[in-house]
Protein backbone atom coordinates (compact mmCIF):
# COMPACT_ATOMS: atom_id res chain seq x y z
CA UNK A 1 0.00 0.00 0.00
CA UNK A 2 1.29 3.44 -0.92
CA UNK A 3 1.38 5.96 1.89
CA UNK A 4 0.47 9.46 0.81
CA UNK A 5 2.60 12.21 2.28
CA UNK A 6 1.02 15.58 2.83
CA UNK A 7 2.78 18.33 0.87
CA UNK A 8 4.99 20.65 2.84
CA UNK A 9 3.16 23.88 3.66
CA UNK A 10 4.72 27.31 3.07
CA UNK A 11 4.95 27.79 6.83
CA UNK A 12 6.83 24.52 7.23
CA UNK A 13 9.22 25.55 4.49
CA UNK A 14 9.91 28.83 6.28
CA UNK A 15 10.46 27.04 9.59
CA UNK A 16 12.82 24.46 8.12
CA UNK A 17 14.84 27.03 6.22
CA UNK A 18 15.17 29.18 9.34
CA UNK A 19 16.19 26.16 11.43
CA UNK A 20 18.96 25.18 9.05
CA UNK A 21 20.32 28.68 8.68
CA UNK A 22 20.20 29.53 12.39
CA UNK A 23 21.74 26.21 13.42
CA UNK A 24 24.65 26.77 11.02
CA UNK A 25 25.21 30.31 12.27
CA UNK A 26 25.07 29.14 15.87
CA UNK A 27 27.60 26.35 15.33
CA UNK A 28 29.97 28.77 13.65
CA UNK A 29 29.54 31.43 16.29
CA UNK A 30 30.11 29.06 19.21
CA UNK A 31 33.20 27.69 17.44
CA UNK A 32 34.42 31.30 17.14
CA UNK A 33 34.52 31.15 13.36
CA UNK A 34 35.17 34.67 12.10
CA UNK A 35 32.64 34.52 9.27
CA UNK A 36 29.82 33.55 11.64
CA UNK A 37 30.76 36.18 14.22
CA UNK A 38 30.81 38.82 11.47
CA UNK A 39 27.51 37.60 10.01
CA UNK A 40 25.73 37.85 13.35
CA UNK A 41 27.15 41.33 13.91
CA UNK A 42 25.67 42.43 10.58
CA UNK A 43 22.36 40.70 11.21
CA UNK A 44 21.97 42.37 14.59
CA UNK A 45 21.73 45.74 12.88
CA UNK A 46 18.53 44.56 11.26
CA UNK A 47 16.75 43.58 14.48
CA UNK A 48 13.49 45.48 14.73
CA UNK A 49 13.88 46.95 11.24
CA UNK A 50 12.09 46.07 8.02
CA UNK A 51 13.78 43.77 5.51
CA UNK A 52 14.02 46.37 2.76
CA UNK A 53 15.87 48.88 4.92
CA UNK A 54 19.18 46.97 4.88
CA UNK A 55 19.95 45.57 1.40
CA UNK A 56 23.40 44.42 2.58
CA UNK A 57 21.69 41.70 4.63
CA UNK A 58 20.09 40.05 1.61
CA UNK A 59 23.14 37.85 1.02
CA UNK A 60 23.08 36.68 4.65
CA UNK A 61 19.40 35.76 4.61
CA UNK A 62 19.43 33.31 1.72
CA UNK A 63 15.85 32.79 0.59
CA UNK A 64 16.87 30.89 -2.54
CA UNK A 65 15.32 27.58 -1.37
CA UNK A 66 11.92 29.28 -1.21
CA UNK A 67 12.07 29.78 -4.97
CA UNK A 68 12.57 26.06 -5.53
CA UNK A 69 9.71 23.59 -5.72
CA UNK A 70 10.08 20.46 -3.53
CA UNK A 71 8.63 17.18 -4.74
CA UNK A 72 4.87 17.14 -4.29
CA UNK A 73 4.72 20.86 -3.55
CA UNK A 74 3.71 23.83 -5.65
CA UNK A 75 5.71 26.99 -6.29
CA UNK A 76 5.12 29.76 -3.77
CA UNK A 77 3.12 32.71 -5.02
CA UNK A 78 4.54 36.23 -4.97
CA UNK A 79 2.54 37.13 -1.85
CA UNK A 80 3.73 33.97 -0.10
CA UNK A 81 7.34 34.71 -1.01
CA UNK A 82 7.16 38.27 0.31
CA UNK A 83 5.70 37.13 3.62
CA UNK A 84 8.19 34.28 3.91
CA UNK A 85 11.14 36.59 3.24
CA UNK A 86 9.92 39.12 5.79
CA UNK A 87 9.40 36.39 8.40
CA UNK A 88 12.91 35.03 7.87
CA UNK A 89 14.41 38.51 8.14
CA UNK A 90 12.75 39.17 11.49
CA UNK A 91 13.57 35.74 12.92
CA UNK A 92 17.24 35.69 11.89
CA UNK A 93 17.94 39.24 13.03
CA UNK A 94 16.29 38.55 16.37
CA UNK A 95 18.39 35.41 16.76
CA UNK A 96 21.55 37.42 16.07
CA UNK A 97 20.56 39.90 18.77
CA UNK A 98 19.70 37.08 21.19
CA UNK A 99 23.01 35.26 20.67
CA UNK A 100 25.18 38.35 21.17
CA UNK A 101 27.90 37.74 23.80
CA UNK A 102 26.40 34.38 24.85
CA UNK A 103 28.69 31.36 25.16
CA UNK A 104 25.88 28.82 24.82
CA UNK A 105 23.37 28.52 22.01
CA UNK A 106 20.31 30.70 22.47
CA UNK A 107 18.55 28.80 19.69
CA UNK A 108 16.99 25.56 20.88
CA UNK A 109 14.28 23.64 19.10
CA UNK A 110 10.88 23.46 20.78
CA UNK A 111 9.91 19.94 21.88
CA UNK A 112 6.98 18.48 23.84
CA UNK A 113 9.29 17.88 26.83
CA UNK A 114 11.19 21.14 26.45
CA UNK A 115 9.12 24.11 25.37
CA UNK A 116 11.06 26.92 23.73
CA UNK A 117 8.30 28.96 22.11
CA UNK A 118 7.80 32.67 22.74
CA UNK A 119 5.18 32.12 25.43
CA UNK A 120 7.28 29.57 27.31
CA UNK A 121 10.37 31.78 27.09
CA UNK A 122 8.50 34.74 28.57
CA UNK A 123 7.09 32.53 31.33
CA UNK A 124 10.58 31.30 32.21
CA UNK A 125 11.57 34.86 33.04
CA UNK A 126 9.08 34.75 35.93
CA UNK A 127 9.48 33.06 39.29
CA UNK A 128 7.67 29.70 39.57
CA UNK A 129 4.12 30.20 40.80
CA UNK A 130 4.20 33.94 40.16
CA UNK A 131 3.12 36.11 37.25
CA UNK A 132 5.29 39.16 36.66
CA UNK A 133 2.77 41.61 35.23
CA UNK A 134 5.41 43.85 33.65
CA UNK A 135 6.93 40.92 31.78
CA UNK A 136 3.54 39.45 30.91
CA UNK A 137 2.46 42.82 29.53
CA UNK A 138 5.30 42.68 27.01
CA UNK A 139 3.93 39.41 25.65
CA UNK A 140 0.44 40.88 25.48
CA UNK A 141 1.72 43.97 23.66
CA UNK A 142 3.53 41.80 21.14
CA UNK A 143 0.37 39.79 20.64
CA UNK A 144 -1.65 42.91 19.87
CA UNK A 145 0.85 44.45 17.43
CA UNK A 146 -1.01 45.94 14.44
CA UNK A 147 1.53 44.83 11.85
CA UNK A 148 4.79 42.95 11.38
CA UNK A 149 6.98 46.04 11.75
CA UNK A 150 5.56 46.84 15.18
CA UNK A 151 5.63 43.17 16.15
CA UNK A 152 9.33 42.99 15.26
CA UNK A 153 10.05 45.96 17.53
CA UNK A 154 8.13 44.47 20.44
CA UNK A 155 9.73 41.07 20.00
CA UNK A 156 13.10 42.79 19.97
CA UNK A 157 12.38 44.16 23.44
CA UNK A 158 11.46 40.67 24.64
CA UNK A 159 14.59 39.12 23.13
CA UNK A 160 16.80 41.65 24.93
CA UNK A 161 15.29 40.46 28.22
CA UNK A 162 15.69 36.80 27.26
CA UNK A 163 19.35 37.36 26.44
CA UNK A 164 19.91 39.01 29.80
CA UNK A 165 18.42 35.98 31.57
CA UNK A 166 20.12 33.38 29.31
CA UNK A 167 16.75 31.97 28.26
CA UNK A 168 16.66 30.09 24.96
CA UNK A 169 14.10 30.41 22.18
CA UNK A 170 13.10 28.46 19.10
CA UNK A 171 13.67 31.19 16.52
CA UNK A 172 12.80 28.81 13.67
CA UNK A 173 9.38 28.15 15.19
CA UNK A 174 9.04 31.91 15.53
CA UNK A 175 9.85 32.34 11.83
CA UNK A 176 6.94 30.10 10.90
CA UNK A 177 4.67 31.98 13.28
CA UNK A 178 5.73 35.30 11.78
CA UNK A 179 4.80 33.94 8.36
CA UNK A 180 1.37 32.92 9.62
CA UNK A 181 0.92 36.26 11.42
CA UNK A 182 0.86 38.17 8.15
CA UNK A 183 -2.22 36.44 6.74
CA UNK A 184 -5.85 37.24 7.58
CA UNK A 185 -6.66 35.52 10.87
CA UNK A 186 -3.02 34.60 11.33
CA UNK A 187 -2.43 36.84 14.33
CA UNK A 188 -5.21 35.04 16.22
CA UNK A 189 -3.61 31.69 15.40
CA UNK A 190 -0.19 32.81 16.63
CA UNK A 191 -1.60 34.36 19.80
CA UNK A 192 -3.24 31.04 20.64
CA UNK A 193 0.07 29.25 20.07
CA UNK A 194 1.87 31.69 22.34
CA UNK A 195 -0.80 31.27 24.99
CA UNK A 196 -0.49 27.48 24.96
CA UNK A 197 3.28 27.80 25.11
CA UNK A 198 3.04 30.19 28.06
CA UNK A 199 1.04 27.67 30.09
CA UNK A 200 3.17 24.66 29.04
CA UNK A 201 6.49 26.26 29.90
CA UNK A 202 7.81 23.59 32.29
CA UNK A 203 10.47 21.23 31.00
CA UNK A 204 9.50 17.61 31.66
CA UNK A 205 11.78 14.94 33.08
CA UNK A 206 11.90 11.42 31.66
CA UNK A 207 9.07 10.30 33.92
CA UNK A 208 6.85 13.08 32.59
CA UNK A 209 6.98 15.24 35.71
CA UNK A 210 7.85 18.93 35.41
CA UNK A 211 11.56 19.57 35.84
CA UNK A 212 12.99 22.59 37.56
CA UNK A 213 13.21 25.68 35.40
CA UNK A 214 16.98 25.62 35.31
CA UNK A 215 17.58 21.87 35.02
CA UNK A 216 18.03 21.94 31.26
CA UNK A 217 19.99 25.14 30.93
CA UNK A 218 23.70 25.66 31.28
CA UNK A 219 24.26 29.18 32.51
CA UNK A 220 26.56 31.12 30.26
CA UNK A 221 28.89 33.98 30.83
CA UNK A 222 29.38 36.97 28.59
CA UNK A 223 31.97 37.03 25.85
CA UNK A 224 33.21 40.23 24.35
CA UNK A 225 34.06 38.87 20.90
CA UNK A 226 31.05 40.69 19.44
CA UNK A 227 30.35 43.37 22.00
CA UNK A 228 29.75 45.88 19.24
What are these regions (language model features)?
Residues 1-33:
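Short, extreme N-terminal leader segments that mark the start of a protein/domain
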Residues 23-90:
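N-terminal interaction modules that seed assembly of large macromolecular complexes
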Residues 49, 53, 67, 71, ...:
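Amphipathic alpha-helical interaction surfaces
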Residues 66-121:
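Aromatic- and glycine-enriched beta-alpha-beta binding-site module
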Residues 106, 111-180:
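Conserved binding-pocket/active-site segment within a compact domain
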Amino acid sequence: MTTLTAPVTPRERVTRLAAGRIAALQRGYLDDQSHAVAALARLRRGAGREAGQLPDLWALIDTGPLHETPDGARPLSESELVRAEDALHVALTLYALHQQSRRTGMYQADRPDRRRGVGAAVRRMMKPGEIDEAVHKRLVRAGTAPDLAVLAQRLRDIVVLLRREDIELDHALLAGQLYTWQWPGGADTVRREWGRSFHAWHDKSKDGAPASAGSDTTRSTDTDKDAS
